[in-house]
Amino acid sequence: VLAGECELEDVIVAGPAGLLVVPAASGVAGMADLPPSAYGGLINAFGQLSGELDVLLVDTAAGVSEGVMSFARAAQEVLVVVCDEPASMADAYALIKLLSRQHGVSRFRVLANMVRRSRDGRELFAKLLAVCDQYLDVVLEFAGVVPFDDYLRKAVQRRQPLLEAFPRSPAAFALRQLAEQVERWPRACGASGHLEFFFERMLQAIPAAAGGTA
């Protein structure tokens, strides 16, 4: 798509309930961490969908690569997903620290993933909150938990969405709750639409990213 060899609609996979998925660039070197010079092509590609999407959800990799940072600082909402592992907590803190100190992002939502009990998710959030309160000037909001659930693994094996394969599973219930939360999050203002807001922020990120590498 970025090379102009096909249109975005040629690679989109249609999912249930109007969900559209743009598959990740598995095994393609350089696609997971696009340089700022490629943002224009990305924006043009997604511009084809500007009249069709209610929500644009970007699932980035873990860590603080330039690609991750570019998408995160352009997003209206940053949802940090953490699990109870030292590497996950370190990645989450590093992302929050860089976005807050270098790009002025001051509010983050935190989702605890693969926890055994809701209380464990709250405790995980409290640990991250304590560190951020001590060293950073940011606001963290608890977005909930997604429990460890064997049904999720089974859904992956079946190559089916969890909410279709096992709609009554604990993880499916948690994801439904999260989706209902997202619907209540405030909408972007100052742009003619949700995608336009995101694209404006992406364009603003180009000189910032270029300046950081000079």
Which role fits each region the language model picked out?
Residues 55-154:
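Conserved catalytic-core segment of NTP-binding enzymes
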Residues 170-188:
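Extended, charge-rich low-complexity interaction segments
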Residues 36, 61-62, 68, 118, ...:
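Conserved phosphate/pyrophosphate-binding and hydrolysis machinery centered on Walker-type P-loop NTPases
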Residues 191-214:
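A short, charged, Gly/Pro-tolerant segment at domain boundaries
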Residues 156-175:
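C-terminal boundary of histidine-terminating zinc-finger modules
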Residues 1-51, 151-161:
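P-loop/Walker-type NTP enzyme "switch/lid" segment
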Residues 164, 187-194:
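C-terminal helical "lid" subdomain and adjoining coupling/linker elements of P-loop NTPases
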